Amino acid sequence: NRLLNLSVLSLGLTLGAAQAASSLSDVTWTQDADTRQVACTYTLTGDAALVTAEVLVAGEPIDGAHLGFFIGDVNRVIAAGEGHWLSWRPDKAWPGDPQAVTLRLKATAPEDGPDYLVVDLSADRLGDVRYFASAEALPYGGLTNDVYRTEKLVLRRIPAAGVVWNMGSPATE
């Protein structure tokens, strides 16, 4: 099969100065001309980081609903090292023209991750944790799929930094 090299739009590494200990390098993207499957390998140096990927068409990100078919070392916290990989199946996720696709790989500190966290509760993958930017970006067609009632626990971040709150009743009760 003939492999098409995809341009890497960005190695978007948006870490603050205090978190600049992680970086992505040796990023290689290819796309199989027959199956349209996109494959990527990369190296993460420094601290563990949350690695996410974004698909762009004509420089614009596609809707999160089409990103559910990423597999591998993506949408999760990844330890530093070489040989990390991910793949995306546009033939299953996105009906658009595959020739205009570029991809953006991004590493962030785990505490700065996206709003949605999914814990796999199935026996063979118990404890597998993935992160997603929106409910629409969840695999299997989104939050309304029954898999999120039986095999996967979806949690949404509640921004509460600096908020003082008490749990329980006061001592006078």
Task: Give a label for each model feature.
Residues N1-V8:
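Bacterial N-terminal signal peptides that target proteins for export
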Residues Q19-A33:
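Short, compositionally biased P/S/T/A/G/V-rich stretches that sit at domain boundaries
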Residues Q19-S22, T102-E173:
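Short, compositionally biased
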Residues R36-C40:
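Structural beta-strand segments of beta-rich domains
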Residues T43-A48, V57-G59, K92:
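Extracellular acidic, Ser/Thr/Pro-rich low-complexity tracts
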Residues T45-L50, A160-V163:
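Short proline/glycine-enriched turn/loop motifs at strand-loop junctions of beta-rich domains
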Residues D63-A79:
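Solvent-exposed serine/threonine-rich low-complexity stretches and specific carbohydrate-binding patches
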Residues I78, K92-V101:
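Short glycine/proline/serine/threonine-rich loop/turn segments at secondary-structure transition edges
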